[in-house]
Each structure stands twice: as structure tokens, then as C-alpha cells.
A protein has these predicted regions:
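Bacterial Sec-dependent N-terminal signal peptides
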Residues: 1-22
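N-terminal active-site segment of His-dependent metallophosphoesterases
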Residues: 17-82
Length: 276
């Protein structure tokens, strides 16, 4: 059984498991390793070197878990890219759960039935929900929302609301996805980088209704922070191919009973230990 499928079992189990304690902890988010992008699918050697350094950092910091918010590979049909990404994940300590979510490149842009089926064969799941220390963490397949895969998206929406309803006694509800709901403004027009406005409004209203505090996303390949009322969207830079001014790096998120605190660190600026 592969490393990622092992954690699928954990994810399913944790949907129904609750935790009484509220001790602070931290997790790591990284996004868009996109194996193959740097050399236009001719090689992924540069991504491998970067991700091996990231693994060393993760193993040293020993976070509660790691979330990779999509675009694991540049070409979702390139088995070599997929295999290398999965190999890198196996280098992370076995006691650190690793959760992944699909990006548009993983599903070949259109999120067809075939691409979703292939993704599920490789990773075992395309969304997740678990509780840890009285906080609820939910990961969505955002490419199917973007691509308007109506039937699949509706099923996911029902699943999402059910899990939000079941988490009302939690201190926090935190969402993960590849696409941010919007890039600059909640009412901005549809574009490649955001969720279409018709669907966007549904999800933003749901975030408000169930008091979701944070979303951590990727896709843009640069860092940004946006808000919709009390709902905060944090977009994290690509770990391998930044398109903005920030260095490649990771986001460390500290979860306290009464607040969420997060910082982005360039790969050469990450502290050797984290103080809570």
C-alpha cells in the first residue's frame, strides 16, 4: 500500500473521530511543486533537488501534518513526474501525515471523468476531512468547481456542508484547496485564476454561515492574502516555480485554541525549531 493511500485510511477514520484536547500545534502547507514545469516537461531534476531540501526541513520540524495544495506535477499524464513526486513523499517521516489535493495540472485542466479517475488511482482520494485538537480541517477538489463538473461538484458541496455542520463545536474550521475563491475582490469577473462567480458566491456564503476562519490555497505561484468578512484566504507561493517576488518556501501555520497564526518562510530562512 502506498504512503498516500495509507493516509487515505487515516482521513476516512478521522472524519468521525473527535479530540477533546485543544493544545496548540503547527502544520506545514506547501503548494505547486509542479514536477516538470521548470524544464517544460523535459526533466524534473530541479524540482527533485528542491523537494529533497523541503523534506529535510519537514522531517526536522516534525509538524502535526503537511498539506500540499495541488499541482503536484506539470503534466497529469506523465507517469514519471507522478512517480517522482510520490517517491519524494515517501521520504517524509512516517509519523507525519501528508495530505494532497488536486490542482488543474493534476487533472489536465478540464477535470474530465478520465483525468479524475486516473488521479484517484494514483492518490486514492481528492478531498479530505479530519479533526485534530478540536479543529476541523477540510480539503476540497477545487478544479471540479472551476471546470463546472456539475454532478461531482454538487456531491462535494453536500459533503462539505455536512462536515461543516458536524464541526460546529470545534474551535476552528480550516479549508484547503488549489484554487482560491477569488484573487483580489469577491465580486471580480471570472478568470483563469479564480472560481467562477456563480459558484464562488455559494461557497463564500457557506464559509460565512459556518464561520470558517481560514482557507489556504495555491495556484497563483505567489503569496497573497485576501478576506471576505471574517473568512481569510491565504495564497501560498509555489515551492518550485515562483512567479512573484517571494523566494520559494513553505507556510508554517500555528493553531491555538483562540487564533490561527501563519508565516511564510523562504527555503533558506526556515527556523530550525518552532516555538508555540
Amino acid at each position: 500500500m502506498s504512503r498516500l493511500l495509507v493516509y487515505l485510511v487515516t482521513v476516512i477514520f478521522c472524519v468521525t473521530k473527535t479530540f477533546a484536547q485543544s493544545e496548540p500545534f503547527y502544520f506545514i502547507q506547501l503548494s505547486d511543486p509542479q514536477f516538470g514545469m521548470l524544464e517544460k516537461n523535459k526533466s524534473f531534476s530541479q524540482e527533485t533537488k528542491i523537494m529533497e531540501k523541503v523534506v529535510a526541513v519537514i522531517n526536522n520540524l516534525n509538524p502535526a501534518f503537511v498539506v500540499i495544495t495541488g499541482d503536484m506535477v506539470n503534466d497529469g499524464e506523465d507517469q514519471n513526474q507522478i512517480n517522482e513526486f510520490k517517491r519524494i513523499c515517501t521520504l517524509i517521516k512516517k509519523n507525519i501525515p501528508v495530505y494532497v489535493l488536486p490542482g488543474n495540472h493534476d487533472l489536465n485542466q478540464q477535470s474530465t471523468d478520465e483525468s479524475i479517475s486516473c488521479y484517484m488511482d494514483e492518490y486514492g482520494y481528492d478531498c479530505f476531512c479530519f479533526h485534530l485538537n478540536n479543529s476541523c480541517f477540510i480539503g476540497l477538489n477545487t478544479p471540479i468547481i472551476f471546470a463546472n463538473r456539475e454532478e461531482k461538484e454538487k456531491k462535494q458541496l453536500v459533503w462539505l456542508e455536512k462536515n461543516l455542520e458536524n464541526s460546529q463545536k470545534c474551535n476552528h474550521r480550516i479549508l484547503f484547496g488549489h484554487y482560491p475563491f477569488f484573487v483580489k475582490e469577491p465580486n471580480e469577473t471570472n478568470r483563469y485564476e479564480n472560481i467562477p462567480i456563480k459558484k464562488r458566491k455559494i461557497y463564500l456564503d457557506l464559509m460565512d454561515k459556518y464561520r470558517v476562519s481560514n482557507m489556504f490555497a495555491g495556484h497563483l505561484h505567489y503569496n497573497a492574502m485576501r478576506s471576505y468578512g471574517n473568512f481569510n484566504i491565504t495564497i501560498t507561493n509555489s515551492i518550485c516555480t515562483p512567479l512573484g517576488e517571494d523566494r520559494i518556501g513553505i507556510r508554517i501555520v500555528k493553531v491555538y485554541p483562540d487564533k490561527i497564526v501563519h508565516d511564510y518562510y523562504g527555503l533558506d530562512q526556515i527556523p530550525s525549531n518552532i516555538t508555540l
